Amino acid sequence: MVRSTAHAARRPEPGGTAGGRVEAGGSGSAAGPRPGRGPGLVACHVIAWRNADSRYPFLWEEGVGSQPAARWHAEGEGPVQYLSDTPDGAWAEFLRHEDIRDPEELSYVRRSLWAVDIGSEHLASAELPAETLTGDAGSYSACREEARRHRSAGSSGLMARSAALMPGAAGGWRVDAGLQPGAERDGQTIVLFGGRPDLTGWRAVFEGRPDVTLLAAVRFLS
């Protein structure tokens, strides 16, 4: 996730708040000073990333089409929105599910990448073993039950380790005498329950593809 203001607080870690919840953007969502924070500080919004077919919107809508079942929802439980905390994570989700492993096949990809302001969502933390969070379709049942548990408790969504990225593969890059790998960290998937007409997105890429080097960072289904 990317903070959309320059005065953001440190990124919260998954499960970093009491009660198994993750604050995705701090305690306020308005772009103005927070009470008790002092002058010159502003609330920060959180940018998440969504990969989508360029012919369609970046989120699923209520009553528009039938969303296929996926890790965190069964058939008929949508809409559920799936986003990633990094652009690489969003691309990896697509590559994993389409089983694109060949660099030559990658050259034909034309997809949109959206930057989505998810504000200050207070997300539940998925409390499942790593092998369940990152497993194949056989692990989906347990993940769906976990999503139902949080949804019935009133959560607007949850955050979980990315199933599509290998461990440590969400580190990105930094510039120091040229491009250097960033510090290793695990990617996160952001799951939002229901239609979300309140969210704003920007098309960062209209018809593009990821760098071929990302293929080595993808955890494929088999």
Residue ranges and their predicted role:
Residues 86-87, 91-97:
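A short, charged, amphipathic alpha-helix used as a generic interaction element across diverse proteins
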Residues 75-85:
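A short, exposed loop/beta-hairpin motif centered on an aromatic-Gly-Thr core
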Residues 2-3, 13-15, 19-75, 97-222:
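Active-site and NAD+-binding cores of ADP-ribose-processing enzymes
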Residues 10:
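An N-terminal RHG(E/S)-centered segment typical of histidine phosphatases
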